Amino acid sequence: MAGGRSGSRELPETPTWAVAVVCAVLVLVSAAMEHGLHNLSHWFRRRQKKAMGDALDKIKAELMLLGFISLLLTVAQAPISKICIPKSAANILLPCKAGQDAIEEEAASGRRSLAGAGGGDYCSKFDGKVALMSAKSMHQLHIFIFVLAVFHVTYCIITMGLGRLKMKKWKKWESQTNSLEYQFAIDPSRFRFTHQTSFVKRHLGSFSSTPGLRWIVAFFRQFFGSVTKVDYLTMRQGFINAHLSQNSKFDFHKYIKRSLEDDFKVVVGISLPLWFVGILVLFLDIHGLGTLIWISFVPLIIVLLVGTKLEMVIMEMAQEIQDRATVIQGAPMVEPSNKYFWFNRPDWVLFFIHLTLFHNAFQMAHFVWTMATPGLKKCFHENIWLSIVEVIVGISLQVLCSYITFPLYALVTQMGSNMKKTIFEEQTMKALMNWRKKAMEKKKVRDADAFLAQMSVDFATPASSRSASPVHLLQDHRARSDDPPSPITVASPPAPEEDMYPVPAAAASRQLLDDPPDRRWMASSSADIADSDFSFSAQR
């Protein structure tokens, strides 16, 4: 008995120095992580990267959520292990095949429970009952949720890094817009045939013009030259013409980079619908269905479909340029519109990318978890080569989504009808919001002054006796012969005006009349500013 207890000592049997060392290590590691995140947040603020700071705050929120889940699993471990269900219900929808070894292990576990005088499984005391989830299985689930969150955040950071790496080439194209060669290319005095422009020739070739082959061309184009220099410059000019002045010196590359950072704070989090998707995958992971095998190709299909659709948007804009005019003046002008996107919603593209990143992280986390946990490798990886293929597909999908699809999304979705709020710098946005706030306050003052002015007008105009008494309503009344005569009631004189309007209201009205006229003029001049809308349509 003593030998059996030597490997499972409880806290009273543990040396104090061992407890202190373990606690010190845990506290120091946690404090170092918290201090590092705090310094990183300050670094983002100093460099005026508010979107990245918000993304870091969302990562902190995910870590807090993990802490709550960990706490709930620890607290609820004992109560859940005492929830008993019939063995018939416990033997259906299993993720692994219940073989002879499992049956023998279950029998041996039952014998050990009986030998331990009820010190084992709580539900083993009842005939035909088993626990809903054992303490060991809850511990394994706890580890899986932690691994899933770590992989999701890691994949999002990789996506952002590879996307920024791809966009570095676009910065060189942006700098060329200040050259004389570019100014000559977009000179409005130049006339060219539409089909001779580089943008139209690239996207409306012999195969691209055929409706049936256009989707095939768009599918393969996302792998080879998804965004070229002529594509970037044409969409840049179209965005400036639609939302800014034509000769504006606008840094389109910097705007896209800010938009990408703003979208990153969306994809880095795990929303409630994504948690439900993960729970659904766990529920469908039944032996014989091969759910984890065929569902691993779903994010790949989504990414390829999204990339093809984005390339199709560029082709449709080129087709519209050709259909609009045979001869163009200056550079070809694309017209941003939501009609190019699914259901006129460009923000749906970001949702599909977010779903893909989460699902891919789920697959990789499940693979690492089952390979590292003793006893799960044989269950979930009966065909190890098929599992290796899943890993290769997942890695390829991550590179494709990060280096091709995500930057392509950042560029093409700017061709929607609305511009994002990142069109302004952070300080400019704060100034506009403060301006709007002050204008709303002035509008409230103006409305209050107008109300008091109306009260003063009513105060100065005496009410007529006709409207003060209801006797005039009897002029059209014809008395019947059988009606008894009724005495005529003379209306009482109207009440004094001091009774009709209390003293505070009258005093306030007189105070309004004594106010200088420039104060009321300033309040009325802010009406248009207060009614202005400084909100921006966020395409996400």
From Swiss-Prot:
The chain crosses the membrane at residues 17-37, 61-81, 143-163, 266-286, 288-308, 348-368, 384-404. Residues 474-483, 512-521 have a biased composition (Basic and acidic residues). GO terms for biological process: defense response. GO terms for cellular component: membrane. Residues 426-447 are annotated as: Calmodulin-binding. Keywords: Calmodulin-binding, Membrane, Pathogenesis-related protein, Plant defense, Transmembrane, Transmembrane helix. It is found in: Membrane. It holds the Pfam family Mlo. May be involved in modulation of pathogen defense and leaf cell death. Activity seems to be regulated by Ca(2+)-dependent calmodulin binding and seems not to require heterotrimeric G proteins. This is MLO protein homolog 1. The C-terminus contains a calmodulin-binding domain, which binds calmodulin in a calcium-dependent fashion. Residues 468-526 are annotated as: Disordered. Residues 1-16, 82-142, 287, 369-383 are extracellular. InterPro entries: Mlo (IPR004326). One of its GO terms (molecular function) is calmodulin binding. Belongs to the MLO family. Residues 38-60, 164-265, 309-347, 405-540 are cytoplasmic. It is a multi-pass membrane protein.
